[in-house]
């Protein structure tokens, strides 16, 4: 194999930003345009280059925590991507607009008709749950930035993403200049670019001016509106990538092999945190695919490609709502997730080989796979190994109403698929041999000073369990569970389930698909 090009940190961050665009229902390149615009406004306002760089990263990653606790949004509102699109069109501080939004979406995640109205208590409970999710988004974005090696200022800024100039924001209800300037800038720039996607310029100006002094810093509003025509110039994602990723920042660095692995883990966790049902899935596929490569005696460079392909194989799911009760149409859209992943990764030359590999991970030798219906001669050894590893791992996880198969049952299913001509027999043999060697069911070591009981509770919490459910599962009182959770949060230095789940993913504490 030809050695791949070096990967720069900002290329990874750019890929994350593009994936976020999918997840929040915005045009691909929205985050890149916001980064360019935020940096330009910071300079226009006389900021030094350090603050301009912070504004760039805030524009790029402001919504990067969006997948945290998506299961809560799914349960309440159904399609979370459609919900995010609609939230972007209203004034969240206006109770009338919020009530109309909630009524139009609530119950969509459940069977039966949506309610036409409900009482204050129900509305309050729904909004309380939504606000907890927003808290999680802020903390998750900050933690992802930390793992990507971005500065403490960038981490702090991302933790303030949902704050408002008038103090009515969250998580800390900061007021005025207590909110970092890059946050104030990127918030207005983001909103202008979103509104510009469906409103004429005059209406964008009216909307933004109506929030001046309330949600937005008036000085920032003035600076942004003075450059609004430039900010709203349409730019396709290729041009936005060239400008935002290739032409920017002096603090960009090339990643070592170890740093690239960590960066790929960040992208994997961004996807897997979307649902307790898949938490840890990408890391498990990665470990199994790499081990299968060892059995198959592929080169060290090819094993690295398998390892990273396993981590990123489901990156395209950023564009797919769910996971619950997908309609037939959405199931068909879900079959495009390998395409979406390849599209994201091919922007960076050093990541393109990973994109090529994972584009084939649902293809089958007999042409029955997706998204291209490729056949055996077109499928590489590595794609065959990754396909078999993903199949085995998925079968051993609980998915929706399907219970997890035992390793023996999963092995039998893979052998049957091989005999039927769907999966490669040699790849299946390598994966099954590797599955007996990886030790993925080993006892979890204590970390961060957590007791064995606290690790149990952390795992249950990361799987989406409510306190009462965890209490029943572990035969504890709800109060005891709550006390343990507060102790866990203190030891981990987090405040939300999203932050705790990221910690558990990073430390390998989760067995995917366990309920």
Region annotations inferred by a language model:
Residues 443-482, 491, 507, 511-515:
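Helix-turn-helix DNA-binding segment
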Residues 3-447:
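Metal-dependent catalytic cores of enzymes that make or break cyclic nucleotides
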Residues 62, 313, 483-490, 502:
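Base-recognition residues in the alpha-helical recognition helix of bacterial helix-turn-helix
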